[in-house]
A protein has these predicted regions:
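Alpha-helical metal-binding/catalytic segments enriched in His/Glu/Asp
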Residues: 47-51
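Extended beta-strand/beta-hairpin segments
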Residues: 1-45, 55-131
Length: 131
């Protein structure tokens, strides 16, 4: 699994992976052009969309209509470290959602691989090479 990181200009940094180019930029206040999400915004979106995928798959496998289902993700920053200390993901279900599946849809959402990697982080190795 290799990803190529490129620098197209300004504060933009792109990731080329699996046939896609994931573009990032910084907000205007940080000197960027605000032409794409920031890397941290993509990180948070990856978590939410991953959990959303598992909720979607759960419902599709059971023929449950997705109308009225949405996720809300809220992040709380630690005032001392300025890092996110807690992430709450609320699965909003319509009144028509089958009661017997309420706990099970949460269990399905727990399977998200992005969430699992945050709970069990990999080791990082940053280094340089000269070409």
């Amino acid at each position: 699994m290799d990803m190529k990181i490129t620098f197209p200009g300004g504060k933009q940094v792109n990731a080329e992976y699996n046939g896609f180019v994931h573009k990032t930029d910084q907000p205007l206040a940080a000197g960027g052009g605000n032409t794409a999400p920031s890397p941290f915004d993509l990180f948070l979106a990856a978590l939410g969309t991953c959990v959303g995928f598992y909720v979607l798959s759960f419902c599709q496998q059971r023929g449950i209509d997705m109308a009225g289902i949405e996720l809300r993700q809220a992040m709380d920053r630690d005032p001392q470290t300025h890092l996110i200390g807690r992430i709450d993901i609320e699965i909003v279900l319509p009144a028509s959602f089958p009661e017997k599946y309420r706990a099970a849809v949460v269990q399905a959402a727990q399977l998200c691989m992005v969430k699992k990697h945050l709970e069990n982080p990999p080791k990082f190795n940053l280094f340089t090479t000269i070409r």
